[in-house]
Every structure is written in structure tokens, then in C-alpha cells.
């Protein structure tokens, strides 16, 4: 049995857990939260009926899941060479030959095509934004910037921040300041989140010759960059003034807590890995808490 036959044989036994790894389901699920929040705010602020908007929300969530999962699968296809070098990636089905390249590409493009069809069925802006997200993530991030510049994380933050725009346009069919504010929050959140992870894995990235900021410029430059994005994030809740003073205060406190944690990195003899772990965990909690606040406070305003 040749290698291609072996790969095809292995791919027939791909488990659901492995499929989740291929499409990076954890990343996808995290992006569905701001996507839903975008739709929810469009419903509340434009006085749409939630019940009558459920079909659009479901189509948006399914379409977004498919295009993000498909783009991530294509990213895994392209990154097989570097993933095979990095110790933390050894259990990926694309590395241990649990799925053939042919089946991986069929899965990837199939998901993206169906997802885009659903988004375009909603309206043209949703489909176009989804397409821009795919092109940005696959071409400008995965293929180009990830391997060639320390700005890769910032460049990848543009396509990574489109979910709330898709969510909003799925309901309203246009882009508003509120939608842009949600986009900016996700955009600023990503460098902090991924730099924290990159600090923990800087040796792996160096081994794979990936120019992540901590690997190329070191910890000092990285923590300054993270602090910069924390400062930029600080005033963004004020762009969501339509949610009221309570939201602005709570979101600002959330930002200040993260800013304080960022400042602790400038203490003498900081344990870099321990600090990066704290920043990474805070970033995960931040994403959930911020968008839950968006939904809950806007819900309270309805009554």
C-alpha cells in the first residue's frame, strides 16, 4: 500500500474530535460569540423582532462556522511543514497523516463554498465581508505574513475581527459605528491574546522559523507592544455609548484590570512564562465577559 493509499485509508477513520482539530473548533466557537453579539445588537438597536430574526441569526451562525472552519482547515493544509516541526502540533490529524491532502482540501473548500452561499443568501454585505475574511486569513495571514514578518499577528487581526461585522450585516444589511466598535475591540484583543501565547511557545516558533514577535524581538519588545494594544483598547467602550453608562463603566473596569495585569510585566525579575499564562487566561475570559455584557445589558434595556 503506497503513501497516498495509506493516507486515504487513515482518513476514513477520522474521528469527530479530530475533525474539530482540523477546523480549529475552539477558535471558531470563540468567534461565534462576537458574531452573535453583532446580530443581537442590530436587533435591539434597530428595533427588530428577535423571533422573526431567528432564521437570519441561524443562517449567519452556520455560515460563519463553515467559512471559519474551512479557512482554518486550509490553514492546516498549508502549515503542515511547520506544524510537523513544532512539538505542540504533533497531534494534529494533518501532521500525523490521519487525513489525506485531497480530503482535507475537499473539506476546506466545501465548507467555505457552502458557508459563503448561506451568507450571500442573507445579503450581499454579509457574503462580501465573509469572503474578505477568508481571503485575508488564508492569503494575507497564512500564506504571506505568518512566515515573513513580525507584523503577522497584527495583519491576521484584520480578518480575525470580521465576525461581529458579519453578525450585524446579517440583520441590518449595512455597517454602523456600533459594528465598527465591536470590530475594533476584537482587532485590539487579538495581538494581546496571541502574543501571550507566542511568549509561551517562542522556542517552538524559532524552531519552525516563524517570525513571531517574541521569537524575533524578544520579551521586552513584546510586552511593550501588548501594553500598547491594551491602551488602545481602553477607550473603545465609549464608542458603544448606546448601551448606556453601566456598560461603559463595567467594560472600562474590565479593560483596567487587564491593563494592570499588563503593567505587572514591567516589574523586575518578572517570570515571563507565568505572566504570559495569566495574560492568556485573562484574554479568554475577557472575550466572553465583554460580549456577555453587550448582550445582557442591551437585553435589560429592552425592559
Curated annotation (Swiss-Prot):
Membrane topology qualifier: Multi-pass membrane protein
Protein's cellular compartments: Cell membrane
GO BP, sorted A to Z: heme O biosynthetic process
Residue runs in coiled coils: none
Catalytic activity line of the entry: heme b + (2E,6E)-farnesyl diphosphate + H2O = Fe(II)-heme o + diphosphate
Top EC group: transferase
Function description: Converts heme B (protoheme IX) to heme O by substitution of the vinyl group on carbon 2 of heme B porphyrin ring with a hydroxyethyl farnesyl side group.
UniProt-recorded name of the protein: Protoheme IX farnesyltransferase
Biological source species: Staphylococcus saprophyticus subsp. saprophyticus (strain ATCC 15305 / DSM 20229 / NCIMB 8711 / NCTC 7292 / S-41)
Amino acid at each position: 500500500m503506497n503513501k497516498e493509499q495509506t493516507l486515504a485509508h487513515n482518513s476514513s477513520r477520522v474521528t469527530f474530535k479530530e475533525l474539530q482539530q482540523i477546523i480549529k473548533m475552539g477558535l471558531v466557537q470563540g468567534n461565534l460569540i462576537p458574531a452573535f453579539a453583532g446580530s443581537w445588537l442590530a436587533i435591539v438597536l434597530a428595533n427588530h423582532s428577535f423571533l422573526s430574526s431567528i432564521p437570519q441569526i441561524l443562517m449567519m451562525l452556520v455560515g460563519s462556522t463553515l467559512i471559519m472552519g474551512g479557512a482554518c482547515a486550509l490553514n492546516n493544509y498549508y502549515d503542515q511543514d511547520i506544524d510537523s516541526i513544532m512539538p505542540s502540533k504533533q497531534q494534529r490529524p494533518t501532521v500525523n497523516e490521519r487525513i489525506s491532502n485531497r480530503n482535507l482540501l475537499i473539506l476546506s473548500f466545501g465548507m467555505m463554498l457552502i458557508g459563503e452561499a448561506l451568507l450571500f443568501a442573507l445579503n450581499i454585505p454579509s457574503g462580501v465581508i465573509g469572503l474578505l475574511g477568508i481571503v485575508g486569513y488564508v492569503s494575507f495571514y497564512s500564506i504571506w505574513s505568518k512566515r515573513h514578518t513580525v507584523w503577522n499577528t497584527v495583519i491576521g487581526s484584520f480578518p480575525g475581527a470580521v465576525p461581529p461585522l458579519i453578525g450585524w450585516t446579517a440583520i441590518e444589511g449595512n455597517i454602523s459605528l456600533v459594528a465598527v466598535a465591536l470590530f475594533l475591540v476584537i482587532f485590539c484583543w487579538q495581538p494581546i491574546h496571541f502574543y501571550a501565547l507566542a511568549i509561551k511557545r517562542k522556542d517552538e516558533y524559532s524552531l519552525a522559523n516563524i517570525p513571531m514577535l517574541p521569537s524575533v524581538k524578544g520579551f521586552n519588545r513584546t510586552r511593550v507592544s501588548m501594553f500598547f494594544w491594551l491602551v488602545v483598547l481602553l477607550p473603545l467602550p465609549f464608542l458603544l455609548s448606546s448601551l448606556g453608562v453601566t456598560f461603559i463603566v463595567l467594560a472600562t473596569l474590565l479593560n483596567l484590570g487587564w491593563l494592570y495585569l499588563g503593567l505587572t510585566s514591567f516589574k523586575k525579575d518578572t517570570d515571563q512564562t507565568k505572566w504570559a499564562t495569566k495574560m492568556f487566561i485573562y484574554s479568554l475570559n475577557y472575550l466572553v465577559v465583554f460580549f456577555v455584557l453587550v448582550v445582557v445589558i442591551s437585553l435589560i434595556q429592552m425592559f
